[in-house]
Design a protein with these regions (language model features):
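Conserved AMP-binding/adenylate-forming
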Residues: 271, 303-305, 312-330, 334-435, ...
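Structural core segment of the AMP-binding/adenylate-forming
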Residues: 63-64, 91-168, 492-495
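Adenylate-forming
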Residues: 77, 122-132, 234, 261-265, ...
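Conserved AMP-binding A3 loop
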Residues: 46-49, 189-213
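AMP-binding/adenylate-forming catalytic core of the ANL superfamily
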Residues: 103, 110, 120-122, 278, ...
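Conserved pre-ATP/AMP-binding loop-to-beta segment of ANL
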Residues: 33, 144-145, 157-193, 200, ...
């Protein structure tokens, strides 16, 4: 039987347009052109200005040959150009590649080469690392330099490279530029790189549809009314700021930019701009609470703080609550555009004591609104594990906020999507109430201050030293950072290498946030087949460091 609802009812331009979050900014500029979109120091930009500058960026890039499928990279802090890049780059059909500003030169060079980057927008503060990167990468992207007038630089000396000033580049753009809608909502909008747990980092490709849906989902899940005020304590290079650069245009909200996460400007922003929402790793909460009591003030409006990574300690949660913040725990990956799981709080839980509340808040939670399916499965049988809070399985996802795939990596895609599910590599239990809780990371990722650190990468650095015969790196709980790397090192015979040498070696070969905090020199436990027993080291590390 022919389905009558499929006869002569084809999609056409009148009833179907590809979903894209770029449309949020166009609407905001049409409906609320004079409303303040961006606050940065003394700078204020309206939605009309925000939209115009984004179009001019798109036009200027288009004039230089950037079009559908072109990669444009950014090495920017949480400043207005980073927001403009999230619109202007895809408006010319390009794909935004937001680079973690804390990475070392070799890793950034790899990403630029792998993504075939053609432009690099960077902040003057990062010019030294840019120069080092360009000496190591094969591609030669055109450099666009942003000099922040709201910031005092130590030096404004130019290095001998072909650089265009960001504002001058925007001036080349046409204010009447007709920006490009995606031909298909499955078209790529961004590429972001994983931390490289098993070799080189993988390029995670996200599409317009997923970004649109997660951006709207953020607004609903975070209960963000129209004209909410969002403070940028979360780096925008992390999963495109969890799609909040697009969310805020959907609700005609105000972005409050922040170059550095420090206590005083955070408290001042909350007071002066009536910030309603902010996000970040537990370390950001520690920064907020580091402000002297005498320099704080009583928060008279609701401020929601969304945190991911390692569960925050009980005392941090208590003090945040006492200080006037409503804290919600999220979980997600680069491969899911950021948050895909939320710890939905039940009102009756407020009557529990703080210990019980902290235990509940340590759970990752339930599926995010735009996610279709979230399960904990046995990866061998692909069957659900019992929801008993004890049986461990792998967290798997299905839905429109799962990545398009890994760039130029067919084998990794086949493995990641095996069985019709996205395999996260994270191990968890499912509680009887349907809330999942992470128990381990099969990829041995260490989450420190919201940054993903590969234990394998650190181990490989140790093994490059002639004194070292073996190394194993684990995560150790840390009050400030959530987790920190801890290294166990076996030395070759008759080698005299100590903690000072090891730390110096790491500082010379790793980004600063990847350098281990603890070093122990001893025999590393192994299985009968020679595999390192990291579960033994985790318990030993906690004992040796006095953590739990």
């Amino acid at each position: 039987m022919v389905n009558p609802y499929n006869q002569d009812l084809d999609a056409n331009s009148a009833n179907y347009q590809p979903l894209t979050p770029l449309s949020f900014l166009e609407r905001a500029a049409d409906v609320f052109p004079e409303f303040t979109a961006i606050v940065h120091g003394n700078l204020r930009r309206s939605y009309a200005e925000f939209y115009l500058r984004s179009k001019k960026l798109a036009s200027a890039l288009s004039q230089q040959g950037m079009t559908r499928g072109s990669t444009i990279s950014t090495l920017l802090l949480n400043t207005p150009p980073m927001l403009e890049a999230h619109y202007g780059i895809p408006m010319c059909g390009g794909v935004i590649h937001a680079i973690n500003t804390r990475l070392d030169a070799a890793t950034i060079a790899f990403q630029l080469d792998h993504a075939d980057s053609q432009f690099l927008l960077y902040d003057r503060e990062l010019s030294a690392i840019v120069k080092e990167v360009l000496s190591q990468c094969k591609v030669k992207p055109q450099l666009i330099e942003f000099i922040d007038k709201e910031h005092s630089y130590e030096s404004l000396d130019n290095f001998d490279l072909d650089v265009i000033d960001y504002e001058e580049f925007l001036d080349r753009g046409d204010s009447n530029y007709q920006w490009l809608m995606p031909e298909n909502e499955w078209d790529a909008i961004s590429v972001g790189y994983t931390s490289g747990t098993t070799g080189d980092p993988k390029g995670v490709v996200s599409h317009h549809r997923g970004a649109y849906l997660l951006a709207q989902g953020n607004a609903m899940v975070a209960s963000m009314p129209k004209h909410s005020v969002y403070l940028w304590t979360l780096p925008m290079f992390h999963c495109n700021g969890w799609c909040f650069p697009w969310t805020m245009s959907a609700i005609i909200g105000t972005h409050v930019c922040l170059r550095q996460v420090r206590a005083e400007p955070i408290w001042n922003s909350i007071k002066n701009h009536k910030v309603s929402h902010l996000c970040g790793a537990p370390i950001v909460m520690s920064v907020i609470l580091s402000q002297d009591q005498k320099n704080r003030f009583n928060i008279t409006h609701e401020v929601q703080f969304f945190t991911a990574a390692a569960p925050p300690p009980e005392n941090i949660l208590r003090e945040m609550q006492e200080s006037g913040f409503l804290v919600t725990h999220l979980y997600g990956l680069t491969e899911t555009y950021g948050p895909a799981v939320i710890n939905e709080w039940h009102q009756e839980w407020n009557s529990l004591d703080m210990n019980a509340q902290a235990s509940l808040k340590a759970r990752q939670g339930v599926r995010y609104l735009p996610l279709e399916h979230l399960k904990v499965l046995d990866p061998d049988t692909m069957k659900q594990v019992p929801a008993d809070g004890k049986t461990i399985g792998e967290v798997m996802f299905q839905g429109n906020i799962v990545m398009k795939g890994y760039l130029k990596n067919k084998s990794a895609n086949q493995k990641a999507f095996e069985g019709g599910w996205f395999h996260s590599g994270d191990l968890a239990v499912m509680h009887p109430d349907g809330y999942l809780q992470l128990k381990d990371r099969s990829k041995d990722i260490i989450i420190s201050g919201g940054e993903n650190i590969s234990s394998i990468e650190i181990e490989e650095v140790f093994l490059k030293n002639d004194c070292v015969s073996a190394a194993a790196v684990i995560a150790i709980p840390d009050q400030k950072w959530g987790e920190v790397p801890c290294a166990f090192i076996e030395l070759k015979k008759d080698q005299n290498w100590n903690e000072i040498h090891a730390k110096q070696w790491c500082e010379e070969n790793l980004a600063s946030f990847k350098v281990p905090k603890y070093y122990f020199f001893e025999n590393i436990p192994r299985t009968s087949t020679g595999k390192i027993q990291k579960f033994v080291l985790r318990e030993k590390g906690k004992s040796l460091t006095g953590t739990n």
